[in-house]
């Protein structure tokens, strides 16, 4: 019996950074294929719509791995399939082929960022380093991404300008891939969650607002949940405290108080292990 509700999936579950050790992070070899498998399962269940959360991905493959799992193929000049189409193999790809399942329902992407796919604010430049991309490799990743993005646009009959759509760079370009191949619609993730939990009324009645993130930086203020919450609270003239493992903000608005909870000498791995104690200590010290 076909389901009558929507399905919810996310990239972090199948293609996320949390699934890898630090030394395993390498966007040349990670793939979103598993995300496509999750979506296939939702399609098989007969859902009428899919909400895809695209935070926390370990990939920079433009969503090609997920699209590959769902039916698209990527061929070399001899007509042989390259699968999965990870960035390390992109130089071999000459053409995409195939289509997604005919019964693919509407896909809505809950997206917390407004980054385009390419450029200084793009997927690789902003989020590549946390996924293991070396600074010296950024130009090569950018060039490869631009070529594959153009191939996918041409295959789907979409304008190359799709590459510049705000949010297309989310999750290493997974948003771009699904916008291009599945006509996916982007939803501001922070707005979606805020509406679901009626955050506006809670903010209005609050005295102070406390939020947090692993690393609070300029990208946090480009649509991510904690940054969006802080920005709205400041608009309501609330005092906001942000507790984060690391703080790296270029400009700090008035009434926004930032607290880095991790000692400078502590390793990232130890910080993860000690996060609960560090946060408790920092809050007790402040309040």
What are the residue ranges of the model-derived segments?
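N-terminal loops that bind phosphate or other acidic moieties
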Residues: 1-54, 58-287
């Amino acid at each position: 019996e076909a389901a009558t509700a929507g399905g919810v999936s996310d990239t972090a579950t199948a293609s996320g950074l949390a699934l890898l050790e630090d030394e395993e992070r390498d966007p040349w070899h990670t793939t979103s294929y598993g995300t496509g498998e999750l979506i296939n399962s939702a399609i098989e269940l007969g859902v009428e719509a899919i909400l895809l959360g695209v935070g926390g991905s370990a990939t920079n493959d433009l969503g090609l791995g997920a699209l590959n799992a769902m039916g698209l193929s990527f061929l070399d000049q001899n007509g042989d399939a390259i699968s999965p189409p990870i960035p390390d193999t992109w130089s071999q790809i000459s053409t995409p082929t195939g289509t997604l399942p005919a019964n693919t329902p509407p896909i809505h992407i809950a997206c917390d960022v407004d980054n385009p796919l390419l450029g200084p604010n793009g997927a690789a430049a902003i989020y590549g380093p946390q996924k293991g991309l070396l600074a010296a490799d950024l130009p090569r990743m950018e060039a490869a991404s631009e070529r594959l993005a153009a191939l996918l646009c041409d295959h789907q009959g979409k304008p190359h300008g799709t590459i510049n759509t705000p949010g297309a760079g989310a999750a290493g370009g997974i948003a771009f891939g699904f916008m291009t191949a599945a006509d996916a619609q982007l939803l501001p993730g922070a707005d979606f969650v805020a509406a679901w939990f009626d955050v506006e009324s809670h903010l209005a009645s609050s005295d102070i607002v406390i939020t947090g993130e692993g690393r609070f930086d300029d990208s946090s203020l480009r649509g991510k949940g904690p940054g969006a919450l802080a920005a709205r609270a400041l608009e309501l003239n609330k005092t906001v405290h942000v507790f984060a493992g690391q703080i790296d903000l270029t400009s700090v608005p008035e009434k926004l108080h930032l607290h880095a909870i991790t000692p400078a000498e502590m390793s990232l791995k130890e910080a993860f292990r000690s996060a609960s104690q560090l946060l408790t200590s920092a809050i007790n010290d402040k309040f």
